[in-house]
Amino acid sequence: MRVYNFSAGPAVLPEEVLREAADEMLDYKGTGMSVMEMSHRSKAYDAIIKEAEKDIREIMNIPDNYKVLFLQGGASQQFAAVPMNLMKNKKAAYIITGQWAKKAYQEAKIYGDAVAVASSADKTFSYIPDCSDLDIPEDADYVYICENNTIYGTKFKTLPNTKGHTLVADVSSCFLSEPVDVTKYGVIYGGVQKNVGPAGLVIAIIREDLITDDVLPGTPTMLKWKTQADNDSLYNTPNCYAIYICGKVFKWIKKMGGLEAMKVHNEKKAKILYDFLDQSKLFKGTVEPKDRSLMNVPFVTGNEELDAKFVKEATAAGFVNLKGHRTVGGMRASIYNAMPIEGVEKLVEFMKKFEAENG
């Protein structure tokens, strides 16, 4: 029996995608082999990666002057690649809204003068700071955000005013969850293991003028975006199978009605859970309502023993991976695109029952 998987990542994938992949596991489209066994230089695989790029461009309405790169090393590797490729003036502005933004900021400080221009650390990252009038150094090469904070459950509803500077966004946990205007960003990147596919792949969407040979001295060949762009993400062997699964997820999103439909689907799920948390006598959310994520919903009972009891009983009932991040405790329900509305409805039913028995 399949469970309702609320993991923050790797996370739930559309069941029909998994079934399709299972059907093609031993023989992909008459090739007599699995995609896992296929040469990345073969015509069959070339068609897979090209179609994946075509579909994500269509879904996100990506302009022609942006490159789509399928990279390895996860989002964490881009914490270094971003300053290596963009720090011409050795300066950058970071908005610290959680652990992943903080880690990216700390990495950037290795390569240049990274400054924190806003932070929500004062209230345990439970809100998004006002970013309408930031004190950004004039010669900053870029402004960096983590758009959705997986651990703390916050989301930028309005992008920061970068005052003409390039915006770089880690969108790992909100990737393809709603429509996005790509032209507002210089760089968008995300690990796919939360909302798009299996672990081990990051998709980067980068404006072409930012892809140059003018990188920091000592930048490894593999971390130069130009290396990857010039070779259509095939400089070395890519994560072939993850790209194949992502391609299937892109088709699923198109079939579901695209990103507008995804947003409606995700808003419905989030509303069911937040509405319950707002009226519950036992459970409570931990985020400022105006900054709540549609993807990651942290909540607590206020009692660590009760939290642990809830997680244990929920797991036994088929609601798995609800334990909060190890650094913050409590609970967290990650309700990505592939989580059905029924999964959230049944979780809330279980929470009501638990509250009646333990409140």
Positions of PLM-derived features:
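PLP-dependent enzyme catalytic core of the Aspartate aminotransferase-like
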Residues: V3, A316, G329-G359
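Active-site phosphate-binding strand-loop segment of PLP-dependent enzymes
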Residues: G9, A108, S120-F175
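Active-site C-terminal subdomain of aminotransferase-like
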Residues: P14, V192-Y274, E288, E357-G359
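Conserved N-terminal alpha-helix of the aminotransferase class I/II PLP-enzyme fold
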Residues: M33-Q78, N85, Q99, E107
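PLP-dependent aminotransferase-like
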Residues: S76-D141
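Conserved active-site segment immediately N-terminal to the catalytic lysine
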Residues: V168, V182-Q193, V202
